[in-house]
Amino acid sequence: SAIFGGDVRVPGQVYAALVQAPTFGATVASVDDNVARSRRGVKDVVVLSATATSAAAVAVVAERTWQALAAVADLRVEWTPGPGATHDTDAQRARYESLARTGEARVFDAAGTPDLGLAAPPILLDSLYHVPYLAHAAMEPLNATALVRDGSCEIWVGNQAPTLVRWFAAKTADVPADRVTVHTPYLGGGFGRRVEMDVVVQAVTLAKRMPGVPVQLVWSREEDMRHDVYRPMATARCRAALDSRGNVMAWVTRVVSQSCTGSLVGRLLPAAASDAMKDRTALEGLFDLPYDLPHRRAEHVLTREPVPVGYWRSVGYSHNAFFAESFVDECAHAAKRDPFEFRRTLLRHAPRHRAVLEAAAARADWGAPLASGQGRGIALAESYRTIVAQVAEVEVRGAEVRVLRVVCAVDCGFALDPDIVRAQIEGGIVFGLTAALLGEITVKKGAVI
């Protein structure tokens, strides 16, 4: 049967759990661990300093996982607030909305003379969109098992970057990289989260204190949600000019967000980090639109926040496709055109995209009557050379939104295993609906609540 990271068992293994800084950047001031140490099975209580990859924490090592988790609850930790102690996502959103209009931006894609088209068109649209921070929330919480002995290190961890695991394990254990053995079991969901090295550094640090003893560190679900590297919060300002017949004369998008790539590089490869680096992931899905928009510009306003961000399933496309397709709908409405037909017109030079759009609309019976309170929407995106169109049928009752059906058409080229493609698409639909309706991460007074 499949072995995941949490299934790993090594002879003589002990177990660890931890509590991490409650606010971004906080450090440990003091620890009262008397009650925790008195619990049966507890072997050690360890203060873990903050690193470039991980928050400050206090860990308990015990004979069993439950003993470690229970002892963590008995810890009395005093924390010294850090620079992120006052951070608030409501205030951040207000600041982003201002920056979307006035911030200094870097241009990623430009063609034609969009500003001329925006000067005095028959129809002008100017819209703001916003998405929150999102956690990865993989089904299997973070875990790693490490063994340090005789100048070597062995580690078992579900991961998306074994070379980085080797580097960071070697540095933490203070052994040569060629003395590190990395085992990569199945991982219970990655989505970009398991390219990070926080749990690796923490597990190896604990194992180094207990030479010859394998230590399995398991994060609780609460720690997993409060100490993710999140999909960035982002605000977009989208402007378009339409002529009197509803044709797009100009299209300008500006996104305000942190840099996923810059944040990740700063944690994992700090020597390569540079403020001059342009992060294409911040605007992917906007600078590479398939639509016929000869007068366009896509630009990014870079921000820096105490909230760590990283790669999240589909990265920039996860929010930029939403921005672009929502605005296409607004343009269609302003032009008094059907959203499907409006897109077909914009795809006159993109036959593959147009075929996918038409397939989704046909399979969904686009234009068929709907019951009162129900609606139907369509969207198209290309991400990593795969073209996807979806039609969603929804029902609104008061404040409740119910998704009744999603029809999806995909052109990914040659499908070597169609069942895997189907599984990925079905999972992506559920993932996207969860993100849109339920996934918001809120920060108050520097803490995820």
Predicted features, each with a name:
Residues 1-416, 437-445:
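Structural alpha/beta core scaffold segments of enzyme domains
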Residues 415-430:
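Conserved phosphate-binding loops in nucleotide/dinucleotide-binding enzymes
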Residues 421, 443-449:
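Hydrophobic alpha-helical bundle architecture
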